[in-house]
């Protein structure tokens, strides 16, 4: 939340000064990308007046924040759609996500709108349906291909290190927990070796799994602190160059499947779900 606030405010001021609303459109999408996670984690939050120069910032309700996010996404998508239709590259030299491809940003914005719509459907079905419909029926639409994914790895002359790998490798704090291990073992889920690395061949501890490899999970209830117990357990199967994903086409297909289950006019839930798996 706080890390996104200052850059967003600077881009807002710069775009107004330079007459570049498309830059502010990108800033809005990035802000919502970060702040919707804060909203879902903590509930009511400062939003509409978050950047005001005052010590007394009011909190907005969850409904107010979601409503504002939908409206801001709509405006940002509209601005970038015009640029996409005219083949305009938006800040390509500084864009580490899509290299200035306005069409990709519109797809991401619409996909983010669909995600938010499906997250509010139990609280406000009418609002959810309105913006889910708007997202999928947009002229450019939502993500449909793997290369539509919003992710950080390399771009704009920069290389990014995966933050989970950094925590696992440098701080020895990100390890496999006993709950996920129990589920994966119980169902003999082949994703076990995709998600986590087996123990070193010289390890004298661990549990042999159905795939013939040995894993060790952090015991349930263990103290959340850096220590040798964490260090000795199975790491996430993530490398330094593994992209950090914000949103992928596979999630969008699953969201469309969910929408199709509850509303008419959203296609086949079965078809969307299978496409999500294939993606």
Predicted regions: what is each one?
Residues 1-279:
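Structured, solvent-exposed acidic/aromatic patches
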């Amino acid at each position: 939340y706080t890390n996104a606030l200052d850059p967003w405010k600077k881009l807002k001021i710069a775009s107004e000064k330079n007459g570049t609303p498309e830059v502010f459109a990108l800033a809005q999408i990035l802000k919502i990308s970060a702040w919707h996670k804060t909203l879902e984690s903590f509930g009511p939050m400062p939003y509409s007046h978050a950047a005001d120069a005052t010590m007394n910032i009011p909190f907005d309700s969850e409904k107010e924040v979601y409503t504002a996010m939908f409206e801001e996404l709509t405006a940002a998508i509209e601005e970038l759609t015009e640029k996409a239709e005219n083949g305009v590259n938006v800040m390509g030299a500084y864009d580490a996500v899509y290299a200035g491809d306005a069409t990709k940003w519109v797809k991401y914005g619409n996909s983010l709108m669909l995600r938010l719509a499906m997250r509010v459907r139990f609280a406000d079905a009418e609002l959810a349906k309105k913006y889910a419909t708007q997202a999928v029926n947009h002229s450019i639409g939502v993500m449909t291909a793997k290369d539509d994914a919003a992710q950080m790895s390399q771009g704009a002359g920069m290389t990014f290190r995966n933050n989970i790998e950094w925590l696992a490798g440098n701080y020895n704090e990100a390890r496999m927990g006993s709950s996920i291990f129990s589920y994966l073992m119980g169902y003999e889920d082949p994703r076990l070796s995709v998600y986590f690395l087996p123990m070193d061949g010289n390890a004298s501890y661990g549990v042999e799994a159905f795939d013939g490899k040995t894993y060790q999970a952090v015991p349930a209830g263990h103290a959340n602190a850096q220590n040798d117990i964490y260090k000795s357990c199975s790491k996430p199967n993530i490398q330094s160059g593994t992209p950090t994903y914000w949103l992928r086409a596979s999630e969008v297909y699953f969201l469309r499947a969910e929408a199709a289950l509850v509303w008419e006019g959203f296609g086949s839930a079965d078809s969307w779900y299978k496409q999500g798996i294939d993606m």
